[in-house]
């Protein structure tokens, strides 16, 4: 059996743009993608801390070092520049490997720069 487990997360990313007329997706600074091993065209879930909206889309590489986090297409209706979002990527893990798998979590500042890298989350942690 396989289970769907969180494998990567960009925590408290700041939305820099919302582009309604783009075809779709989320554009993410490639440095941030690399930090948590998210690849172009990979499916991600976005959770908006400001309004509670949750959506799924795919990733497009953004310019390295730019801090860009841009929701494109229909998703742009669910965010505003300045909103705080959590970007989560899941993967299928075989039952026997569940306890060996540890997610990569990058905690970001207001400029989408990494301030901390975490492994497994602990209950009660407030960031």
UniProtKB/Swiss-Prot annotation:
Signal peptide: none annotated. It is an enzyme of class 4 (lyase). GO terms for biological process: alanine biosynthetic process; pantothenate biosynthetic process. GO terms for cellular component: cytosol. Its cofactor is pyruvate. GO terms for molecular function: aspartate 1-decarboxylase activity. NCBIfam families: panD. This is Aspartate 1-decarboxylase.
